[in-house]
A protein has these predicted regions:
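Intrinsically disordered, low-complexity polar/charged tails and linkers
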Residues: 1-166, 172-174, 181-206
């Protein structure tokens, strides 16, 4: 998990003194947004060859892949532009970066500001509660929400109903939150970390 390249922190945290009398511990003080996937739909057909001439760091080989690939440096982002007018943005690390990346594509078809409003579809965040976790106990206590098969995958999968996100929980205390297949906001990622904290404290290894 250390190879994830975490580079953005968030100061929100939960003090365990607020969680049923546990000793004072700060969980997920420095969780990070690792990747955001968003889309733009400009609702018009795009001539990808013409667009490639307008944009730097663009690649288009229709025999290999049906989209134009564009790499942006500031903010760091990779975009896939399809003929249908759909644009997929990946690699940003905040909602602000998503909006900034979307503005880079206003040159396509003389777009208006409203045409580049991005929709976030998936957000991946990583946190560390700083203590080891009894995954077997967590799985037993919350069997209706969890999948734990250590012979296949070392982490426990926790499917949270509200907010609707998936958490990958590891014995080391590392937790990955992803909003796969749903429209997710950063505030929901924060809520997920808050809601999972008391469960992890109850299954803390001693």
């Amino acid at each position: 998990m250390d190879s994830l390249g975490l580079n953005r922190t968030n100061s929100d945290f939960i003090s365990s003194g607020q969680l049923g009398g546990h000793e004072e511990v700060s969980c997920f003080r420095d969780y990070t947004i690792h990747n955001i996937v968003a889309t733009i739909n400009i609702n018009k057909t795009v001539n990808l060859e013409d667009v490639m001439k307008k944009l730097r760091n663009a690649e288009y080989n229709p025999k290999r892949f049906g989209a134009l690939i564009v790499r942006i440096r500031d903010p760091r982002c990779t975009a896939l532009i399809f003929k249908s007018g759909k644009i997929v943005l990946a690699g940003t690390k905040s909602e602000e970066e998503v909006k900034l990346a979307a503005k880079k594509f206003k040159c396509i078809g003389n777009l208006k500001q409203d045409d580049t409003t991005p929709r976030i579809h998936n957000m991946v965040a990583v946190g560390d509660c700083k203590f080891p976790i009894r995954l077997e106990g967590l799985s037993i206590d919350h069997i209706e929400f969890t999948t734990y098969e250590p012979e296949l995958f070392s982490g426990l999968i926790y499917r949270m109903s509200e907010p609707k996100v998936v958490l990958l929980i590891f014995v080391s205390g590392k937790v990955v939150v992803t909003g796969a297949t749903v429209l997710v906001k950063q505030s929901e990622i924060e809520d997920a970390f808050k809601k999972i904290t008391p469960l992890l404290l109850n299954c803390r290894k001693v």
